Swiss-Prot record:
<feature type="domain" description="Helicase ATP-binding">
    <location>
        <begin position="167"/>
        <end position="379"/>
    </location>
</feature>
<feature type="binding site">
    <location>
        <begin position="180"/>
        <end position="187"/>
    </location>
    <ligand>
        <name>ATP</name>
    </ligand>
</feature>
<feature type="short sequence motif" description="Q motif">
    <location>
        <begin position="149"/>
        <end position="157"/>
    </location>
</feature>
<feature type="region of interest" description="Disordered">
    <location>
        <begin position="1"/>
        <end position="37"/>
    </location>
</feature>
<dbReference type="InterPro" id="IPR027417">
    <property type="entry name" value="P-loop_NTPase"/>
</dbReference>
<dbReference type="GO" id="GO:0005730">
    <property type="term" value="C:nucleolus"/>
</dbReference>
<dbReference type="InterPro" id="IPR000629">
    <property type="entry name" value="RNA-helicase_DEAD-box_CS"/>
</dbReference>
<keyword id="KW-0539">Nucleus</keyword>
<keyword id="KW-0690">Ribosome biogenesis</keyword>
<dbReference type="GO" id="GO:0005634">
    <property type="term" value="C:nucleus"/>
</dbReference>
<keyword id="KW-0547">Nucleotide-binding</keyword>
<dbReference type="GO" id="GO:0016887">
    <property type="term" value="F:ATP hydrolysis activity"/>
</dbReference>
<keyword id="KW-0698">rRNA processing</keyword>
<feature type="short sequence motif" description="DEAD box">
    <location>
        <begin position="292"/>
        <end position="295"/>
    </location>
</feature>
<dbReference type="InterPro" id="IPR011545">
    <property type="entry name" value="DEAD/DEAH_box_helicase_dom"/>
</dbReference>
<keyword id="KW-0694">RNA-binding</keyword>
<protein>
    <recommendedName>
        <fullName>ATP-dependent RNA helicase dbp6</fullName>
        <ecNumber>3.6.4.13</ecNumber>
    </recommendedName>
</protein>
Length: 604
């Protein structure tokens, strides 16, 4: 028992001793921690004090500099004296030009083919017999009493005839863009070389597509091709959208699904319809693509026709998939069939040549780039001294406008009584074969009816017709035929007539409503003075329209200056005034009765 007690009594002091050692160790550690913390705090205080001292010194230095600056400003103010304003120093022109020698003028921004066009004087002519044209085509020209070509033909025909001398399978020239006044013979300048080139073909293929903006122009161009194709074994087809897609496909391929058309004339929308919806339609054999009235076609999307047509030309859908290639499995070993997904990599370069024509052809590279032209050349029919202004810059923001050299323009100042002033102008100047352009279909119909009522009141034989987009195609054809034969002396029309349509014997153009753009003006007045004939353009301008019209016509290049005349209401005979008042009242009654048929008795 004593042993156990002793063990317990001895173990207790050992525990106490160990506890004291741990306590002392803990205190030592705490003291060290406090010392370390104190030392760190002291170091931070020292650094803070040092920083504060440095900051104070920097602040003193800053205040000293501010004081010195204030003293300097006071000295300057004290010495300043009043004087005249002096120009701000500018870098010398020589230094600027030397530092950027490539900055010459705006023409350096354009591609070379746009900045350096082929310029032809409007008075240039050429004998067709002197060109490399076949005897058959020369004979067809002579039957139309055409022996000499105009300026655009003198410039374009040699280029295209040279490019097409090896037939439809080859092309050694680049694309061609042509800007010439309306009525200058642009259509004939591409019809002749295309017919001559394609006459050497062996197998019928769709080798030429002509894209035009209107149905009327489609028919007109197709008739021109048809006349000069006579005896050459070639076929032309016009797509206007009047027939179904199936019928037009039959025109192209017939019963045997073999192409039998060489030249297709179409509006852009109808062409896109066939590309997207007709599996048998293909442009893979094209030799020529003609874009007529290009300014209008490029300004409007027409179902994205440019991108759609360019894609079909570069990647024909008939070559995209081997399943579209007839009898492929019968002519190629089955071993190689799995490797043939498309024939595009094996396609030979296309001989396609693009021909772009317009009276107001843009020089905007961004618009022309969408056509993906290859080695293009630009032909301008204009006087060389009018090509650029005195500063060497392209006029009118890089757009070319020209007027037929045989056209005489008139600026006619009028008051608000325009219908009777128009009637007075026609009779006082003895005008005949007149196209009168009005801003809308409704305004054209109203003016046409008012002129008819004036004729009836005066018992005069003055025939007047109406031509607008609201008429059917057959009605338009009849109207144009009557005007061409002289049965109609005056044709009131909308801008539908202004685009490329060649109405025979048009001598006078009257702008009853001034056009809103220079392009519209050029295309309107281009209906007269065609093919070297004399023509006259009369624009009725009210006082509030004078500034706009004067600014518009300044953008045009012309041979003859504009003449100004003024017609006042006091110039009109009393007989015309009475007839005009009666016609206005009769027209008012007709309009009211057409709108309110149940109240006819109220006005009658």
């Amino acid at each position: 028992m004593s042993v156990e007690v002793d063990k317990s009594s001895h173990s207790k002091p050992k525990i106490e001793k160990k506890s004291k050692r741990n306590k002392r160790k803990w205190l030592n550690d705490e003291n060290k921690t406090h010392v370390t913390a104190s030392e760190a705090a002291i170091e931070r205080l020292k650094k803070s004090a040092s920083f504060s001292q440095a900051a104070q010194q920097a602040l003193k230095q800053s205040r000293k500099e501010d004081n010195e600056r204030d003293i300097e400003m006071q000295d300057v103010d004290a010495e300043a004296q009043p004087h005249d304003l002096l120009p701000i120093p500018q870098p010398s022109v020589e230094d600027f030009v030397d530092s950027k020698p490539h900055v010459k003028n705006i023409t350096s921004v354009l591609p070379k083919w746009l900045a350096e066009p082929i310029t032809v004087d409007p008075n240039t002519t050429v004998e067709f017999s002197s060109l490399n044209i076949s005897s058959k085509l020369v004979e067809r020209l002579q039957k139309q009493n055409i022996t000499r070509g105009f300026a655009v033909q003198a410039a374009v025909l040699p280029l295209l005839l040279q490019d097409g001398r090896h037939g439809p399978m080859y092309s050694y020239g680049g694309d061609v863009c042509v800007s010439a006044a309306t009525g200058s013979g642009k259509t004939l300048s591409y019809v002749i070389p295309i017919v001559q080139c394609l006459s050497h073909r062996t197998v019928p293929r769709l080798r030429c597509v002509v894209i035009v903006p209107t149905r009327e122009l489609t028919v007109q161009v197709a008739k021109t091709f048809e006349y000069y194709m006579s005896g050459a074994g070639l076929q032309v087809c016009a797509w206007t959208g009047q027939k179904s897609l199936r019928h037009e496909t039959y025109q192209l391929n017939g019963d045997e699904n073999e192409c039998r058309i060489d030249v297709l004339v179409s509006t852009p929308g109808r062409l896109v319809d066939h590309i997207r919806n007709d599996e048998s339609f293909s442009l893979q054999h094209l030799r020529y693509m003609v874009i007529d009235e290009a300014d209008r076609l490029l300004d409007q999307s027409f179902q994205d026709w440019v991108d759609t047509v360019m894609m079909e030309i570069s990647h024909p859908k008939c070559l995209q998939n081997k399943s579209n290639i007839l009898d492929l499995d019968q002519n190629i070993s089955p071993t190689f069939l799995p490797d043939i997904d498309t024939l595009l990599p094996y396609r030979l370069p296309s001989p396609l040549q693009k021909l772009v024509f317009s009276a107001t052809l843009t020089r905007d590279p961004s618009k022309i780039a969408s056509l993906k032209l290859h080695n293009p050349r630009l032909v301008l029919v204009q006087n060389k001294d009018m090509e650029v202004d005195d500063g060497g810059e392209i006029e009118d923001d890089a757009i070319v406008f020209s007027v037929p050299p045989t056209l005489q323009e008139y600026h006619v100042s009028v008051s608000s009584e325009k219908p009777i002033l128009l009637y007075h102008l026609i009779h006082s100047k003895n005008l005949t074969n007149i196209l009168c352009f009005v801003k809308s279909n409704e305004a054209a119909a109203r003016l046409h009816r008012l002129l008819e009522l004036i004729h009836e009141s005066l018992n005069q034989s003055f025939s007047c017709g109406l031509f607008t987009s609201s008429l059917s195609r057959d009605e338009r054809k009849k109207i144009i035929s009557r005007f061409a034969t002289g049965d109609l002396n005056l044709l009131v029309c909308s801008d539908l007539m202004a685009r490329g349509i060649d109405v025979a014997n048009t001598q006078n153009v009257i702008n009853y409503d001034p056009p809103l753009s220079v392009r519209s003006y050029v295309h309107r007045i281009g209906r007269t003075a065609r093919a070297g004939r004399e023509g006259f353009a009369w624009t009725l301008v009210q006082s509030h329209e004078g500034h706009h019209f004067s600014k518009l016509v300044k953008q045009l290049r012309r041979t003859l200056p504009i003449k100004r005349i003024k017609i006042e209401f006091s110039h009109i005979s009393e007989e015309f005034v009475v007839a005009y008042d009666k016609a206005l009242e009769a027209l008012r009654v007709e309009v009211f009765n057409s709108r309110y048929p149940q109240q006819k008795s109220f006005l009658t």
